Amino acid sequence: MRHRKSGRQLNRNSSHRQAMFRNMACSIVRHEVIKTTVAKAKELRRVVEPLITLAKSDSVANRRLAFARTRDAEVVGKLFTELGPRFQDRPGGYTRILKCGLRTGDKAPMAYIELVGRPEAAEAVEDTAE
C-alpha cells in the first residue's frame, strides 16, 4: 500500500527521478520557463520553490546547500543574485503552471512552468526529458 507516500513515481527509479528534477530545476532557474508534462511540472514545484526560498537569505551556508541540490555554480549564482532579491517580499508561490494542450506523439497533457514576474523577453525552452 502507498499510504502517506508523497510525490509521483513517474515510472522512474529514485536516482533517475532525482537527476531529472535536478536538471529541470537548473533549466527553470536558467531560462525561467520550460515546457514539460503537467505531472512533471507539478512535481518540479516541490523542488524549485524551496530553492528560491533558500536564496532569499544570502549566506555561504545557503549557497553550499543550493549547490548540493543543483550541482551547478552558474545556477547558484543566478539564484542568489537575481531570483532571491526578486522574490524577497513574496512569501511563496514563485512558480506558475500554464496548461498548453496535448503532446503530438502520445497525447500527454503538456504545460509551461514559469517563474512569476519574469521578464517577458524570455523564450520557452522545450523539455527533452522523457
From Swiss-Prot:
Q: Which InterPro entries match?
A: Ribosomal_bL17, Ribosomal_bL17_CS, Ribosomal_bL17_sf
- The yes or no answer to whether the keyword Ribosomal protein is present is yes
Q: Name one GO biological process term.
A: translation
GO CC terms, sorted: cytosolic large ribosomal subunit
Give a GO molecular function annotation for the protein.
structural constituent of ribosome
Q: A single Pfam family, by name? A: Ribosomal_L17
The protein's UniProt keywords, in alphabetical order, are:
Ribonucleoprotein, Ribosomal protein
Gene3D superfamilies this protein is in?
Answer: Ribosomal protein L17
Please report which protein family the annotation says this sequence is part of: Belongs to the bacterial ribosomal protein bL17 family.
Q: How does it assemble?
A: Part of the 50S ribosomal subunit. Contacts protein L32.
What's the protein called, per UniProt? Large ribosomal subunit protein bL17
The record lists the organism as Shewanella halifaxensis (strain HAW-EB4)
Q: Which gene encodes it?
A: rplQ
